[in-house]
């Protein structure tokens, strides 16, 4: 640790005295990344050529795809159209919690709800569950 600190202190002072021999600022234009503008311009030009080459290749591929579609009468898939995956499913579409709640409330709209027998049905349900609990207490497998 002490050796590291000494090297840092002596190294910083030495570079100040020598003026940073490795760092030349005498007319060689450098950008903030430390590269010559010619190198940057060449890199940008190369990138543009690469992009143009890829654009041309993709256009050629699309022409080839379109030729195959025309030959075999295949329709092009639309990217913006959402696919309906429920068509080939074995089970039906899953219900959201909102749909389940709506079905529970639809019970009032059913025949029992229309006849006004909802209270009697609820009483019968509670009596049946109570009787079941009582009977279940007598049998050893119900515990």
UniProtKB/Swiss-Prot annotation:
GO molecular function ontology, one term from the record: SNARE binding
SUPFAM superfamilies per record: SNARE fusion complex
Q: Name one Pfam family in it.
A: Synaphin
Q: Which keywords belong to this entry?
A: Coiled coil, Cytoplasm, Exocytosis, Neurotransmitter transport, Transport
Compositional bias per record (Basic and acidic residues), positions renumbered to this chain? 23-33, 44-72
- Asked whether the UniProt record includes Nucleotidyltransferase among its keywords, one would answer no
- GO CC, alphabetical: axon; cytosol; SNARE complex; synapse; terminal bouton
InterPro entries per the UniProt record, alphabetical = Synaphin
Q: Which residues fall in a coiled-coil region?
A: 40-71
Q: Where in the cell is it found?
A: Cytoplasm, Cytosol
In its UniProt record, which GO terms are filed under biological process? Answer: modulation of chemical synaptic transmission; regulation of synaptic vesicle fusion to presynaptic active zone membrane; synaptic vesicle exocytosis
The UniProt transmembrane annotation reads: none
Q: Does the keyword Cytoplasm apply?
A: yes
Q: Which Gene3D superfamilies match?
A: Single Helix bin (1.20.5.580)
Q: Where is this region: Disordered?
A: 16-72
Q: Which family does it belong to?
A: Belongs to the complexin/synaphin family.
Q: Report the function annotation for this chain.
A: Positively regulates a late step in synaptic vesicle exocytosis.
Q: What is this protein called?
A: Putative complexin-1
Source organism per UniProt: Caenorhabditis elegans
